């Protein structure tokens, strides 16, 4: 068996490594960026060193994937070339590739991807998988006695960088006719937070990496929106958190001023919140001279758009309704099993209290005689890659792949039929 490279090619991050391993060899941003100190765009570095080595203040960003689909093959080729040569140190001609691709991709994008793999890099064979099917495979292997494993059926909710999918999976194949999508993901959340902060305090519209870091460290899902809005309006310090901006001298990246205080509100009981609600704090205007930003209701209004897309002017259903619509599109025999096998994956599921909020909103929409069980992956960012690594270690993997010779003889469209039935 040839060397197998597993590549989870996300819109935000690339996870890559050798098949059969537990964790990927490297995780890098799927982009090129140009810091203010540089005259040219720089290849991405692994996440463990990215923020420490380079000042990303006002860095320009170029991405090959937009809204989940490949739009710049030349840029993707450049990023992959750096990945294979400098980080993975592999020879594509003697390697097989397991590559993830967003569901419902259009034929022109599929052809471009196949050309990159076989014609530009010369991989010996290729297997394309939907990320959600790999999540299902990994979770079924982790829970051999669960209903998910016994029925080989699940509903994967993938809140990724570009958008959110509710995908029914049966026997490791996605049921494409039942897939539902919300056009919201990590990128949209970051952009919304940039707009809120820029309107209320200082202009951070060019600070993509900075605001993204603040979002990941400070945002959470509200379990009682009206209560939290009242607390924020009253200037209550339990909601407020401060994010310190880099000054370029003592520190080149932002950080949370008091991490423990930022988590304090999450542990409040309902009785305590009623007491503190009556304590009105002094509301102050933003100090434009301070090198920091204060976040109050922004912390929960940003993730709230996942449940209320109408807040952004979008005519789309929220997350709970999206899940119900996806399950209702499946055969009635599958529906009770799908409600018991809901899996949350993707970086945006890391918002605190998201699972609890989803359970509360989903239960009233589900028939009383159906049980609802939601599980969150142990690592929602690496879950897809780990499923791919598991599939790559299967003895049947090579027979599932399309070889370069088959691609050259039959073309992209004919070869694709082997991946998705």
Curated annotation (Swiss-Prot):
<keyword id="KW-0539">Nucleus</keyword>
<keyword id="KW-0217">Developmental protein</keyword>
<comment type="subunit">
    <text>Component of the SWR1 chromatin-remodeling complex composed of at least ARP6/ESD1/SUF3, PIE1, SWC6, SWC2 and H2AZs (HTA8, HTA9, HTA11). Interacts directly with SWC6/SEF and PIE1. Also interacts with H2A.F/Z proteins.</text>
</comment>
<dbReference type="GO" id="GO:0005634">
    <property type="term" value="C:nucleus"/>
</dbReference>
<keyword id="KW-0156">Chromatin regulator</keyword>
<dbReference type="GO" id="GO:0005200">
    <property type="term" value="F:structural constituent of cytoskeleton"/>
</dbReference>
<comment type="function">
    <text>Component of the SWR1 complex which mediates the ATP-dependent exchange of histone H2A for the H2A variant H2A.F/Z leading to transcriptional regulation of selected genes (e.g. FLC) by chromatin remodeling. Binds to the promoter region of FLC chromatin. Required for the activation of FLC and FLC/MAF genes expression to levels that inhibit flowering, through both histone H3 and H4 acetylation and methylation mechanisms. Involved in several developmental processes including organization of plant organs, leaves formation, flowering time repression, and fertility.</text>
</comment>
<dbReference type="GO" id="GO:0051301">
    <property type="term" value="P:cell division"/>
</dbReference>
<dbReference type="GO" id="GO:0006355">
    <property type="term" value="P:regulation of DNA-templated transcription"/>
</dbReference>
<dbReference type="GO" id="GO:0000812">
    <property type="term" value="C:Swr1 complex"/>
</dbReference>
<dbReference type="Pfam" id="PF00022">
    <property type="entry name" value="Actin"/>
</dbReference>
<dbReference type="GO" id="GO:0006338">
    <property type="term" value="P:chromatin remodeling"/>
</dbReference>
<keyword id="KW-0963">Cytoplasm</keyword>
<dbReference type="GO" id="GO:0009910">
    <property type="term" value="P:negative regulation of flower development"/>
</dbReference>
<dbReference type="GO" id="GO:0009266">
    <property type="term" value="P:response to temperature stimulus"/>
</dbReference>
<dbReference type="GO" id="GO:0009845">
    <property type="term" value="P:seed germination"/>
</dbReference>
<dbReference type="InterPro" id="IPR004000">
    <property type="entry name" value="Actin"/>
</dbReference>
<protein>
    <recommendedName>
        <fullName>Actin-related protein 6</fullName>
    </recommendedName>
</protein>
<keyword id="KW-0611">Plant defense</keyword>
<dbReference type="InterPro" id="IPR043129">
    <property type="entry name" value="ATPase_NBD"/>
</dbReference>
<comment type="similarity">
    <text>Belongs to the actin family. ARP6 subfamily.</text>
</comment>
<dbReference type="GO" id="GO:0006952">
    <property type="term" value="P:defense response"/>
</dbReference>
<dbReference type="GO" id="GO:0030029">
    <property type="term" value="P:actin filament-based process"/>
</dbReference>
<dbReference type="GO" id="GO:0006970">
    <property type="term" value="P:response to osmotic stress"/>
</dbReference>
<dbReference type="GO" id="GO:0005737">
    <property type="term" value="C:cytoplasm"/>
</dbReference>
